Curated annotation (Swiss-Prot):
Belongs to the endonuclease V family. One of its GO terms (cellular component) is cytoplasm. It comes from Trichormus variabilis (strain ATCC 29413 / PCC 7937). Mg(2+) binds at residues 44, 112. Coiled coil: none annotated. This is Endonuclease V.
Amino acid sequence: MQIYQPHPWPLTVEEAITIQEELRHQVITQDQFTQPVQYVAGVDMGFEADGTISRAAVAVLSFPDLQVVETSLAYRPTSFPYIPGFLSFREIPAVLDALEKIQTKPDIILCDGQGIAHPRRLGIASHLGVLLNIPTIGVAKSLLIGRHEELADTKGSWQPLIHRGEIIGAVLRTRVGVKPVYVSSGHKISLPTAIDYVLRCTPKYRLPETTRVADKLASNR
């Protein structure tokens, strides 16, 4: 997969904020992709040597049957510290290396993290989507910002995630009796469509199959 040269990677939080403020205006939260979708991908991260080495995994699955088509791993020195709200600067450099190795271009990428459900509306899914010009969805295991009403226990139940009067995502139940996930538009996809694809990628478990496969690779399991 061809990767174009991204912006320079920052060394300070101040530089990172400047990049986020610039890129947030390029995020598209309407559906802009070709259907039917044939391939979906997941990306996940692991770290080695006390966090000094980043290990990025990409898993491409066929859709809608969710069979593994291609995987890749990439390693590179970690160049940015762990700071909530800035994880994309720590993780995306290695993710781009892993994506460059794959031959099958995904139609949608599901990221283990936030899309626009982020203080500056540029979580890792949105950041990656803008850099690649590919539709992306944020599927996070925990809440970063926002509030929501109580959620019903049935699969497919969801409530809007609201921050400063704006709907920035949804809390979504993907499995009965299990903690929900936090879904948000990353890039070139609307929230209702993002919810639909997350549900179609979670036939058995809480997390999308894309994330589960990528996580096993990234965790060396």
